[in-house]
């Protein structure tokens, strides 16, 4: 029995801005995930990444891990729709995520269906 979602890491130098991961779930839906590590509030994107998410607003996501001081030994995950990239550019991690932990993020990906 297959475990879903299925992940593929994308290494692409010819298509600038392409997200880091391509996922596929049990509902036969493909989606992309841009991975970010954030210190503080600001999320850094290249102009190519911004353009990608503006051109492809459906089934695209941004997963940000916020690093905390090493004394706390934990980090937090936040998942955003790719269509919210301009809010992330402007407001950073103050943007409201659609999921805030690993389990909730996995449920978003597992439950994607055709429009």
Regions found by a protein language model. Give the residues of each.
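Acidic-basic catalytic patches of nuclease active cores, encompassing PD-(D/E)XK
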Residues: 1-13, 26
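Structural signal for conserved beta-strand scaffold positions within catalytic alpha/beta enzyme cores
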Residues: 8-11, 34, 62-64
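Nucleic-acid nuclease catalytic cores
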Residues: 56-84
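Charged phosphate-binding loop/patch that engages nucleotide di/tri-phosphates or the phosphate backbone
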Residues: 91-115
């Amino acid at each position: 029995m297959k475990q879903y979602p299925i992940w593929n890491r994308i290494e692409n130098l010819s298509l600038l801005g392409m997200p880091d991961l391509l996922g596929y779930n049990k509902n036969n839906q493909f989606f992309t995930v841009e991975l970010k590590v954030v210190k503080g509030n600001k999320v850094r994107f290249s102009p190519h990444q911004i353009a990608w998410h503006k051109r492809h607003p459906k089934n695209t996501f941004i997963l940000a891990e916020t690093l905390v001081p090493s004394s706390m030994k934990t980090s937090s995950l936040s998942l955003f729709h790719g269509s919210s990239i301009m809010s992330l550019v402007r407001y950073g991690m103050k943007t409201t995520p659609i999921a805030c932990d690993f389990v909730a993020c996995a449920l978003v990906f597992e439950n994607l269906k055709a429009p």
